[in-house]
Regions:
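Gram-negative host-targeted secretion-system effectors, predominantly Type III and Type IV
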Residues: 1-168
C-alpha cells in the first residue's frame, strides 16, 4: 500500500481498541514512523552549504501527503517545546494541531517514536518550508475575487413576481 493512501489516525491505541480500529491505528503508526524517517533522510540529503533545498519538503509530501507530514512535524515540535532553536511561530502553529497522548503499558507516550531527530534548527527550517509550501498550494487553488466575479452569471435583470399581471398604473 502506498503511504500517501493510509489515513492519519489521530486517536490513541486505547480508543482504537475500544472502537475496533486497531488495524487503522497500526497502519497509521507505521506510516508516521516511515514519514519521520523520510523527513530525517530528506534533511540529511538536501542540506548543503548552510541551505536546505526546497525539494526536501516536496519530496516527502509527495510520498506521504501533506496531512501526515504536518501531523508528524506538529508532534515533533510539540515534544520539543522546550527547545529554543524552534521558532515561536512554529511552536504556536504546532499547538493548533491535536496530537493526543498515547501511553503504552509502561506509561511511555508512543508518539515519541515518530519525533524527528534531526538538528532542531534544521527541523525548524523544514517545518517553516512545509508550512510555506502548503500556503502556496492553497493560494494556487483558491480563486481570486476577480475570478469569482467573472464566473458569476451576468443575468442582472430583476425577477418578476408570480403575481405580476402587467404594468400597474
Amino acid at each position: 500500500m502506498i503511504m500517501k493512501d493510509i489515513a492519519v489516525y489521530r486517536y490513541p491505541s486505547n480508543y482504537a481498541h475500544e472502537h475496533g480500529e486497531l488495524e487503522l491505528y497500526r497502519a497509521s503508526q507505521k506510516a508516521n514512523l516511515a514519514c519521520k524517517e523520510a523527513i530525517e533522510a530528506a534533511i540529511r540529503e538536501n542540506y548543503r552549504d548552510n541551505c536546505l533545498n526546497t525539494d526536501a519538503v516536496k519530496q516527502v509530501m509527495a510520498q506521504f501527503g501533506q496531512e501526515r507530514v504536518m501531523y508528524v512535524l506538529a508532534n515533533t515540535v510539540q515534544r520539543k517545546d522546550w527547545d529554543c532553536r524552534i521558532s515561536r511561530d512554529n511552536k504556536a502553529w504546532a499547538k493548533t494541531i491535536s496530537v493526543f497522548d498515547d501511553p503504552d503499558a509502561q506509561g511511555t507516550d508512543r508518539n515519541c517514536y515518530f519525533v524527528v531527530n534531526s538538528h532542531p534548527g534544521l527541523t525548524d527550517l523544514f517545518v517553516t518550508r512545509a508550512r510555506k509550501e502548503i500556503a502556496e498550494q492553497e493560494k494556487e487553488q483558491r480563486p481570486s475575487a476577480i475570478e469569482k466575479l467573472k464566473q458569476q452569471p451576468k443575468n442582472n435583470s430583476p425577477k418578476l413576481s408570480a403575481n405580476f399581471k402587467g404594468q400597474e398604473r
